[in-house]
């Protein structure tokens, strides 16, 4: 078993919230242990897992680099766990990873090598692959991140078309501390986007590494309906909060230059939330939120909702929802195809 010298601080801190799913968490830890670069610590932050899960994972702590830390603060959630992990992290560099994903054996070492060559940067972005049925697939048509294919990354985040995720990156710990970045525990969605937008707005410098994908984002094909999850009251409120926060943050830095793109992100949310028809109260809440930040785009959204509700009397709900937003949907599909063509994973 490989262990770092106890007198030395680790080069890299990996911060990983987890909640049950013991087998998948174990597989993720196994992939970290299999890395050829050895100078790291894993801070596995328990978000209230069962006794059985903790017992199953306990043997990993025989390696002194693996530390299981119990969350004792509120609220429950991955953001609280990540903030706790940041408080405990001792590494010069930080990586935020998810507990059900996969790291290639070269992942940590490659990231350290690249960022140490770029002393002018605060974080670096690396390409990812998907991980389906325990198979690493870098050529998937979607859910691929970390490629330099967007003309403007902030525009991509505003549209909810994410250029990269936090697990795509390696960060200098000092830069995060200096900028006083934290995870917003009010968010149930777009946590990664919020953190990375905060980092960019705070002036953290970054660049893309043009290397082979090193991180596997696990895809599940048997999950519940996204529209049902995103439209439940708690998640819906969180998504509205995320959009409102984007409006506020971008407008503080750029005035109204990004309003159009944040509105397109709202339309993306709208298209997912109202799959089964318009919920009048949720639609009103969405319109009110947009109008608070842009009366122009709030009025457009109000018109769109009214048009959809009229069309629902004559057409299937999906057609009624999408017909008034055809220009947006066509532009979205065009962007998706363009990005897919630009992404060419390195062997």
Where in the sequence are the language-model features?
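Membrane-interface aromatic/basic loop that binds lipid-linked glycans or pyrophosphate carriers
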Residues: 2, 275-347
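Catalytic core of nucleotide-sugar-dependent glycosyltransferases
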Residues: 214-223, 228-256, 277-295
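Short aromatic/hydrophobic "clamp" motif used to bind/position activated sugar donors
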Residues: 94
């Amino acid at each position: 078993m490989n262990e770092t010298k106890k007198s030395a601080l680790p080069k890299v801190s990996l911060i990983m919230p987890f909640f049950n799913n013991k087998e998948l968490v174990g597989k993720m830890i196994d992939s970290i242990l299999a890395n050829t670069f050895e100078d790291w610590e894993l801070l596995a932050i328990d978000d209230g897992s069962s006794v059985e899960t903790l017992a199953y994972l306990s043997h990993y702590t025989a390696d002194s680099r693996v530390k299981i830390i119990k969350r004792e603060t509120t609220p429950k959630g991955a953001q609280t766990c990540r903030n706790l992990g940041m408080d405990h992290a001792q590494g010069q560099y930080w990586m935020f990873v998810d507990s059900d994903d996969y790291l290639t054996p070269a992942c940590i070492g490659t990231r350290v090598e690249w960022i140490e060559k770029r002393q002018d940067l605060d974080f670096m972005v690396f390409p990812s692959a998907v991980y389906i049925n325990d198979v690493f697939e870098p050529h998937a048509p979607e859910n691929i991140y970390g490629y330099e294919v967007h003309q403007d990354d902030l525009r991509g985040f505003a549209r909810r078309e994410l250029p990269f995720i936090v697990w795509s990156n390696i960060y200098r710990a000092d830069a995060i501390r200096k900028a006083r970045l934290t995870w917003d525990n009010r968010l149930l969605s777009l946590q990664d986007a919020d953190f990375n937008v905060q980092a960019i707005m705070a002036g953290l410098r970054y660049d893309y590494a043009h290397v082979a994908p090193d991180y596997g984002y696990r895809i599940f094909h048997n999950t519940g309906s996204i529209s049902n999850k995103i439209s439940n009251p708690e998640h819906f409120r969180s998504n509205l909060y995320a959009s409102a926060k984007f409006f506020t943050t971008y407008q503080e830095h750029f005035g109204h230059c990004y309003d159009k793109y944040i509105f397109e992100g709202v339309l993306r949310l709208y298209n997912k939330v109202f799959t089964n028809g318009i919920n009048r109260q949720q639609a009103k809440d969405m319109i009110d939120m947009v109008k608070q930040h842009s009366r122009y785009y709030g009025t457009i959204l109000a018109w769109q909702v009214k048009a959809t509700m009229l069309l629902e009397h004559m057409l299937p709900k999906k057609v009624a929802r999408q017909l008034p937003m055809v220009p947006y949907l066509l532009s979205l599909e065009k962007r998706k195809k363009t990005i897919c063509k630009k992404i060419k994973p390195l062997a």
